[in-house]
Amino acid sequence: MRNLLKMQAITPEAPLPSLKARQPTVKQESENIALCDGQSLFQELFFFCTVKNVGDVPGTGCIYVETVVDRDSGIAFAKVYSARNAMNAVDILASRVMPFFERQGATIKEIHTRRTSEYCGLPPAHPFETFLATSHIQHLPMERPGQPYNYLCEQFYRFLQKEFFPLALRKHFQLSLVEMQKDLDVFVEAYNAMQMKR
C-alpha cells in the first residue's frame, strides 16, 4: 500500500463515478435485526499509505485508518488520521463508537486490541487505558504477537481498500482528510445499515 498513489496513476482530470455507486446495497425487505449490543468490540490501526506535501498532510507523512468492529453484529467504524497515537485511538471511540451504542441503548463491555503503544500503557498517563477505565470498559489486549484475533477488523479494512479508498483517493486528489472522512462516514453508515439487516 505504500505505493498506492503512484500505482493507481490518479489524476485530477480522470472522470469520477459517484461514491454512491460503490456503497453497499441496503435491502429494503423486513429482516431480522442483528444483535448489536456492544458486548465485545475489536479495535485495530492500519497503515494505509505515505504521501508527500499533499493536502492537509504536511511534509512526508502517513495516512492511517483506525477501525472498530462489533463482534456479534459486524457493525463497524473507521476514521482516517495522519498519525498513529493513543489520542486517535480514543478519538474514534469518543466520536463514533460510543455515541452509536448509546443511541442503541447498549453498553460497551470489552475492547480487544493489539499490545502496542497506541493501546497499552499505565493509567493515568496513558490516554487510551485511562479512557477505557473511566468508561468502565474492560481492555483485553492480545496476549502474544501474531495471534489472529483481529480478523474482523482485517476483513473490514480490506473491504474499505477495495470498495472505498480507490474512489475516494481520486475524488480527494489534493487529499483533504476532513473531506475524505465525510465520505467515509456516509459509506460506513450504508455498510452498517446492511449489517443490521442481515
Model-derived features with residue positions:
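RNase H-like two-metal-ion nuclease catalytic core shared by retroviral integrases
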Residues: 113-115, 119-132, 138-165, 176-182
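Short small-residue beta-strand/loop micro-motif enriched in glycine and branched aliphatics
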Residues: 75-79, 140-142, 166-168
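Mobile genetic element proteins and their domesticated derivatives, centered on retroelements
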Residues: 1, 44, 68, 74, ...
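Charged, gly/pro-enriched flexible loop segments at helix/strand junctions
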Residues: 171, 178-198
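Basic, flexible linker segments flanking DNA-binding modules
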Residues: 1-39, 45-49, 125-129, 147
